[in-house]
Design a protein with these regions (language model features):
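Extracellular low-complexity, O-glycosylation-prone Ser/Thr/Pro/Gly-rich "stalks"
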Residues: 25-47, 55-64, 69-193
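Fungal secretory targeting signals
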Residues: 1-21, 187, 191-193
């Protein structure tokens, strides 16, 4: 007979195993800093080097925002947000420029000057690609209520019927070449695959 604590541990392990990883691919030529913020938890500043990568296990049960800044200080008006939520084994995700866009321009938004993208390797998922210098309100939040303020549907993407056991790739300066790493000093392989 299982005890309540054994069942609780098994349920927790199943929840953790059900989610993939949130991966930041920084294709920019400069470092960025990220903060992972969820309900009741927030990380300190995490440096992601130029042409580098950061990964963390995805959280389920509450929305998570990965806030991106060009400095090690998180200041309102100067950060981009990659956001995701896993609810009832369904992943939802979006990009928000609400804290940095000025009108139709995302030029003040970290990582956006070179384009931003968000996707999963799972083909059932939608994908976001907001190219550099483009106004892309159907791909990212420029205002907090696009239906009311712009007459556009919410730019939230999902993976219909695919569950949540997958990675979610968030790319800064997405117009640049994908990240590569050397294998045995002889060949380059795609870090983002």
């Amino acid at each position: 007979m299982f005890s309540k604590s054994t069942l609780l541990v098994a349920a927790l392990q199943a929840t953790l195993a059900a989610a993939g990883n949130a991966i930041i691919n920084n294709r920019c030529s400069t470092d960025i800093w990220v903060w992972s913020v969820g309900q009741g938890s927030s990380s300190s500043a995490i440096r992601v080097p130029a042409r580098g990568q950061y990964s963390e296990p995805m959280r389920s049960g509450s929305p998570t925002a990965i806030k991106v800044s060009n400095t090690d200080q998180l200041q309102n008006g100067k950060h981009t947000q990659f956001e995701y939520s896993i609810v009832n084994n369904q992943m939802w995700f979006d990009i928000s420029f609400v804290n940095c866009a000025v009108g139709e321009s995302s030029a003040n938004c970290p990582g956006a000057a070179g384009g931003l993208a968000m996707s999963s390797p799972n083909s059932a998922c939608g994908s976001i690609n907001c190219q550099s210098g483009k106004y892309c309100p159907s791909q990212a939040y420029f205002v907090d209520q696009p239906m009311i303020k712009l007459g556009l549907k919410e730019p939230v993407f999902t993976c219909p019927g695919a569950g949540a056991n997958m990675d979610l790739n968030m790319v800064t300066c997405s117009d640049s070449q994908p990240l590569k790493r050397s294998v045995a000093g002889r060949m380059l392989v795609d870090m983002e695959a």
